[in-house]
């Protein structure tokens, strides 16, 4: 029996929000909304081939993210490549939306994490913690909290 390398397995984070799919889609694809819960993006368009970037400072290090939208199915799915300037590795982040009445289940899948440098900064547990906070806390608060739009 072969043991699968945990690092090579897709990272999946799922959450259900008290918001309709149209509202969640807008939060995932409108740059002005994304800046409020995601990252400080200069530009973003939900169009296949659109390239965007952003910089994150964490623990005294700077991480320059380079991304390219690869797939868009309005109100259902958006995917983009995710890599770091000057570092080896390529990954793919996919957001999928599933309507559940007036609620929406979001499934985030991040594949290719194992292609990044084998250093603590790029450890799978850091990606798990980051996506859990972004989707489970920041996006949830944005969609359901006191600043949420109807």
Q: What is each model feature region?
A:
Residues 40-54:
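A solvent-exposed, acidic/Ser-Thr-rich amphipathic alpha-helical stretch
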Residues 8-9, 48, 61, 89:
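Residue-level preference for beta-strand/loop junctions
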Residues 1-43:
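Hydrophobic ligand-binding cavity/cleft-lining segments
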Residues 6, 112-150:
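A conserved amphipathic terminal alpha-helix motif
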Residues 43, 58-105, 111-114:
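Hydrophobic-ligand binding "helix-grip"
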Residues 8, 21, 49, 73-76, ...:
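Residue-level signal for tight coil/turn positions that link beta-strands
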């Amino acid at each position: 029996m072969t043991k699968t390398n945990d690092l090579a397995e897709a990272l999946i984070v799922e959450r259900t929000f008290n918001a309709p799919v149209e509202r969640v889609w807008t939060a995932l694809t409108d740059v002005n909304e994304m800046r409020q819960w995601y990252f400080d993006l200069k530009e973003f368009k939900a169009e296949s081939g659109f390239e965007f970037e952003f910089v994150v400072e964490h623990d005294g290090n700077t991480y320059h993210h380079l991304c390219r939208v690869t797939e868009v199915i309005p109100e259902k799915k958006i995917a983009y490549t995710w890599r770091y300037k000057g570092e080896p590795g390529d990954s793919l982040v996919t957001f999928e939306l599933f309507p559940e009445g007036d609620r929406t289940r979001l499934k985030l899948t991040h594949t290719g994490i194992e292609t990044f440098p084998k250093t603590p900064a790029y450890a799978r547990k850091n990606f798990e913690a980051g996506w859990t906070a972004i989707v489970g806390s920041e996006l949830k608060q944005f969609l359901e909290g006191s600043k949420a739009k109807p």
